[in-house]
Amino acid sequence: MKRTQILDALNASAPCDDIRICGWVRTRRDAKGFSFLELNDGSCLTNIQVIVDEETDAYRSVGEATTGASVDIRGQLVESPGKGQKWEVRAATMTLLGKADPETFPLQKKRHSDEYLRTIAHLRPRTNKFGAAFRIRAEASYAVHSFFRENGFFNVHTPILTGSDCEGAGEMFRVTTLPAVGASAPAEGSVFDGDFFGKECSLTVSGQLEAEIMAQSLGKVYTFGPTFRAENSNTPRHAAEFWMVEPEMAFADLEDDMQLAEDMVKYVISHVMKHCAADLDLFCKFVDKELSARLENILAHPFARVSYTEAIEILKASGRKFEYPAEWGADLQTEHERYLAEEHFKKPVAVYDYPKEIKAFYMRLNDDGKTVAAMDLLVPRIGELVGGSQREERLDVLEARIKELGQNPDDYWWYLELRKFGTAPHAGFGMGFERLLMLLTGIGNIRDVIPFPRTPRHLEF
């Protein structure tokens, strides 16, 4: 008999004389002649109550249906006389699929700390909080794809293994088949002659450059996949492996870029609020009581826009004593970003036209020769959510910028060649998907919105 998901059982329009459900026991309560099971299969936040009568075959195995055990139940879906749930299941048969020793099962009825749950990442999705977080993650991922499909973008798959550093920061994970290439290896490229690719290979930090290639043919594209940064940063906002959403648009400028970022963020938030109401409600009640109002505020108003120069002036005039003083030419720190989004504008704000010295070589040089057509979208509680720019389409300017930043133009011959044959204005951005999830849920640590976090000194699971 086909299994019915608990979500579908709870949303049934009529009783059912024969239903099959499977799931994990959350709790069991024994009474005279009956046992009451709370069962969850991950399809939704709400458990379904199962009544096991001592007169039925199901009662024979009820003693082993301890917290964490998995069971297969057949019975009747009937109206529940209790409050808070329309339906319950009266079990006729129950098969114990997997035992869970109550003495050693790591998830007990008490509320566990996030720090403890990170040590058992293989079991934490069974908790209410993390089950909800990962259902929201799945729905938000679907929303990203839906948004771009509805707006005429093509999804392209960019390489995970790369021979180039998009950001020019050098903080990349090396990939090699050589037995002893490490930090002490010679810097010359010849050391990699015997390697698999015959050259140095790393995990990608961004799919942007390859997405630009595809946009120069397909017009509007996006990539959505894992990226890797070998930054030794143990902060709540950084992970060594995370997912990036990276659209690229031909025949577009910085204005188009900022508008696309705003539209996408609002679309995903609206979609998740519509399709994950119960899961979001958990976070609104127990994680961040201001979450609902914050998300509604984001949807209700146009995002603010301010130049980097104006942002520095706002920070200086704020009277706030920042740990890092706001000075023109210095990058904005998280404390600056959050002040602008949370306290000054009280909503998301796009900061644009940054000094060229603090931005990457591919960002279009503005006419003033001092700034580039870059933008960062800052949001409350998070800081930077999106970073993007109009890309430099002029060959001579791009070559000069690469050399100015001490990089080798030969490494980007293919990227430069795009500017020789039908070059066109284009723009794009990158959004850290986990940071969007932090915004959606109110969760304060990136380790808790990705199933298996990769951070310095942590590579379990």
UniProtKB/Swiss-Prot annotation:
Catalysed reactions, semicolon-separated = tRNA(Asn) + L-asparagine + ATP = L-asparaginyl-tRNA(Asn) + AMP + diphosphate + H(+)
Give the record's keywords alphabetically: Aminoacyl-tRNA synthetase, ATP-binding, Cytoplasm, Ligase, Nucleotide-binding, Protein biosynthesis
GO process annotations (BP): asparaginyl-tRNA aminoacylation
PROSITE patterns in the record, alphabetically? AA_TRNA_LIGASE_II
Q: What is its EC number?
A: 6.1.1.22
The protein's GO terms of the molecular function aspect are: asparagine-tRNA ligase activity; ATP binding; nucleic acid binding
State a GO cellular component annotated for this protein: cytoplasm
KW Protein biosynthesis (keyword) present: yes
Give the subcellular location.
Cytoplasm
Q: Give the matching Pfam families.
A: tRNA-synt_2, tRNA_anti-codon
Q: How does it assemble?
A: Homodimer.
The name of this protein is: Asparagine--tRNA ligase
Which species does this protein come from?
Oleidesulfovibrio alaskensis (strain ATCC BAA-1058 / DSM 17464 / G20)
